[in-house]
Structure formats: structure tokens, C-alpha cells
Amino acid sequence: MGRLLALVVGAALVSSACGGCVEVDSETEAVYGMTFKILCISCKRRSETNAETFTEWTFRQKGTEEFVKILRYENEVLQLEEDERFEGRVVWNGSRGTKDLQDLSIFITNVTYNHSGDYECHVYRLLFFENYEHNTSVVKKIHIEVVDKANRDMASIVSEIMMYVLIVVLTIWLVAEMIYCYKKIAAATETAAQENASEYLAITSESKENCTGVQVAE
């Protein structure tokens, strides 16, 4: 849960035109038959510098030795290589509407065991300065394991336990507050009743005295 929250926050920051950029590691465990996002984020050192970026993704299947290119994304065009393992399964999920890519993530739909292995996200960036241009390149490496069902990590378990503990504590606090308020209201009601009774007795006693005085005068 904690890691998922970090991914969400990182994606929100990267996708915001005016926001910052946070590099977040990708999840590494994909579930068979499900859609899986491989995260690749490469931030510029200086956000105010204009740049153009393109990426190439390569893949080495588990048990093999060579990397093969599976896609290239440049100028908002996704070019997929002919590879039956990824045919109709790869979807671009990175930056859109800009040549200055910082989020270069992809989706793999309907994951199979053939997608287990090592992925490389190659980031090629051309930086434009006032009097010159500068090329940079970065390689993000991600190892993916495909499993039958999701395994919960320790952070997720701890987060859920803390959530239930917080709910229990808040419930106890709420019950205690209700009991306190009830007792306070009951005490105030009892005090008011006693005061009313005292006033009633005083008035009754005064009335009797007045009646006695009238009878004596007669």
C-alpha cells in the first residue's frame, strides 16, 4: 500500500505540467493474465531547460542471454517491433502532448510467463541551451517476475494493520466521548431537577405559611 501510494504521487507529479518530477522505482511483480505497468521515470536536472526526448525499450526473456528491442517512442509516435510475445499487448502510458518526455512508462496487457525477465528503458535526451545543445542518455533497468497471484509485501500488511488499529482507537475515543457527554448531561439534568424540586418545596412551604397567617387573622 505504501509503495502504491508512492507510485500514485510520483505519477501525479510527473504528469503535472507545472509540478516537479520524482523518480520512482517500478513494481517488479506482475500477475498472470492481468495488466501490468512498468514504470520508467527520468527527470531533468533543471526543469527550466528545454529538451526533446525519445525512448527505446529492450527486453531479455528469463532464461535467455540477449536483449531485443520491443518499442521506440518518439514525437508522440509509438513504434512496436514485430514480436509475438508483445503483439497487441504494449500500450504507451508515459508523457503525452510534449516532446520533453519525463515519464516513459508502458503497460503490458494480458501478461504471460513469457514476459518474465529483464527490461531496459533507454532514455535519450537532447538539451537546448542558449549557445549549444547537449545529448544525454540514461538506462533504467527493471526485472519483472510473473506470478499466479499477487503476493502482499510487508509494507502493505503493516499499513493495513495500522489502519485497523487507528479505526479501533478512534472508535474507543468516540465511545468514551459519548459516555462522558451522556454523564455530563445526566448530571446537569439531575441538578436542574433537584433545584426545581427545592424551589417547589420552598414555594409550597411559603404558601402554607401564608394560608396559616390568613386563618389566624380571621
From Swiss-Prot:
InterPro entries: Ig-like_dom_sf, Ig-like_fold, Ig_V-set, Na_channel_b1/b3. Glycans are attached at N93, N110, N114, N135. Residues 22-150 form the Ig-like C2-type domain. Disulfide bonds join C21-C43, C40-C121. The chain crosses the membrane at residues 158-179. Residues 180-218 are cytoplasmic. GO terms for molecular function: sodium channel inhibitor activity; sodium channel regulator activity; transmembrane transporter binding. Keywords: Atrial fibrillation, Brugada syndrome, Cell adhesion, Cell membrane, Cell projection, Disease variant, Disulfide bond, Epilepsy, Glycoprotein, Immunoglobulin domain, Ion transport, Membrane, Secreted, Signal, Sodium, Sodium transport, Transmembrane, Transmembrane helix, Transport. GO terms for cellular component: extracellular region; intercalated disc; node of Ranvier; perikaryon; plasma membrane; T-tubule; voltage-gated sodium channel complex. Residues 19-157 are extracellular. Residues 1-18 form the signal peptide. Gene3D superfamilies: Immunoglobulins (2.60.40.10). It comes from the Eukaryota. The overall expression of isoform 1 and isoform 2 is very similar. Isoform 1 is abundantly expressed in skeletal muscle, heart and brain. Isoform 2 is highly expressed in brain and skeletal muscle and present at a very low level in heart, placenta, lung, liver, kidney and pancreas. In brain, isoform 2 is most abundant in the cerebellum, followed by the cerebral cortex and occipital lobe, while isoform 1 levels are higher in the cortex compared to the cerebellum. It is linked to Generalized epilepsy with febrile seizures plus 1: A rare autosomal dominant, familial condition with incomplete penetrance and large intrafamilial variability. Patients display febrile seizures persisting sometimes beyond the age of 6 years and/or a variety of afebrile seizure types. This disease combines febrile seizures, generalized seizures often precipitated by fever at age 6 years or more, and partial seizures, with a variable degree of severity. Regulatory subunit of multiple voltage-gated sodium (Nav) channels directly mediating the depolarization of excitable membranes. Navs, also called VGSCs (voltage-gated sodium channels) or VDSCs (voltage-dependent sodium channels), operate by switching between closed and open conformations depending on the voltage difference across the membrane. In the open conformation they allow Na(+) ions to selectively pass through the pore, along their electrochemical gradient. Voltage-gated sodium (Nav) channel consists of an ion-conducting pore-forming alpha subunit functional on its own that is regulated by one or more beta subunits. Interacts with SCN1A; regulatory subunit of SCN1A/Nav1.1. Interacts with SCN3A; regulatory subunit of SCN3A/Nav1.3. Interacts with SCN4A; regulatory subunit of SCN4A/Nav1.4. Interacts with SCN5A; regulatory subunit of SCN5A/Nav1.5. Interacts with SCN8A; regulatory subunit of SCN8A/Nav1.6. Interacts with SCN9A; regulatory subunit of SCN9A/Nav1.7. Interacts with SCN10A; regulatory subunit of SCN10A/Nav1.8. Interacts with NFASC. Belongs to the sodium channel auxiliary subunit SCN1B (TC 8.A.17) family. This is Sodium channel regulatory subunit beta-1. It comes from Homo sapiens. The gene is SCN1B.
